[in-house]
Amino acid sequence: MAMTLLEDWCRGMDVNSQRALLVWGIPVNCDETEIEETLQAAMPQVSYRVLGRMFWREENAKAALLELTGTVDYSLIPREMPGKGGLWKVVFKPPTSDAEFLERLHLFLAREGWTVQDVARVLGFQNPAPAPGPEMPAEMLNYILDNVIQPLVESIWYKKLTLFSGRDIPGPGEETFDSWLEHSNEVIEEWQVSDIEKRRRLMESLRGPAADVIRILKTNNPAITTAECLKALEQVFGSVESSRDAQVRFLNTYQNPGEKLSSYVIRLEPLLQKVVDKGAIDKDNVNQARLEQVIAGANHSGALRRQLWLTGATEGPAPNLFQLLVQIREEEAKEEEEEAEAALLQLGLEGHF
């Protein structure tokens, strides 16, 4: 659970999870100064900066995300550190060592009947690199890692798309178009490769009629881009919805019971963008439309909704999506801390009886 939180938090802040620490088990009543003093005392030789703190409801405690800012000796990072209220837990993902990585690479290539020289030749290098070994100079090893192994890793180990065929009844392992498209857009954005490679990976996920559509388009236009392929699939297999229908669906989407307001805003955003794409809302008015619907659709009756109402009542421009989420998340964190403090106070009162 802690590792999942570390990975999700890093992904949300665009931070390399192998350059971050998650410290948790911090008491709710522990302030920023106490947290910093504890971290410095436990890791005096580790260079870091605190990216943020949050209340972790499942643990009824705070958690802090740290980014490692310098050269790191992971042996200096404790798995636990003494702090206020007891031991604080530390979670991190140390990167795989070069030796372990090379060993795993050799095993993989051996199973496939390949050598590093074969890989270099396939990738188009004029002078195939020698096989890496412990006696190899550091400059040559770095060259192989950067120019041979890294392209190989990127082309073999990557997050794959789910399957989509376009059939009326999806087959085993296949998804409906809307869920497939949403997942595909997220994954494709993460791929750090050429558009040609993205298109190849996209084709891997297609079956049946969907694959036939892209093959026909590629035959007519060999230079078709990945974005154009996705657009064509949306036109063929996407739901046919008028601008009026899209707007009605957007305006009738409300916050669910128990759903965080920030989660509601994120769930609302694709519906808003669809309304904008169909021309029902002008792009210049998208921030105002979002704010008005969040105020109207929220079932939150506390200070957070009042603050949003005051934001909408001001004469200034409405906040954009990022600004709105930051405002909401900050208020949610305050409310969670207040709830936790109230719960602790209640437990203390009950302990006196």
Swiss-Prot record:
GO cellular component, one term: cytoplasm
One Pfam family in the UniProt entry: PNMA
GO biological process terms, semicolon-separated: inflammatory response to antigenic stimulus
Keyword Signal: no
Keywords, alphabetical: Nucleus
Classification via InterPro entries: PNMA, PNMA_C, PNMA_N
Keyword NAD: no
Tissue specificity of this protein: Testis and brain specific.
Localization annotation: Nucleus, Nucleolus
Family, similarity comment: Belongs to the PNMA family.
PANTHER family: PARANEOPLASTIC ANTIGEN, PARANEOPLASTIC ANTIGEN MA1
Protein known as: Paraneoplastic antigen Ma1 homolog
Lineage, opening ranks: Eukaryota, Metazoa, Chordata, Craniata, Vertebrata
Gene: Pnma1
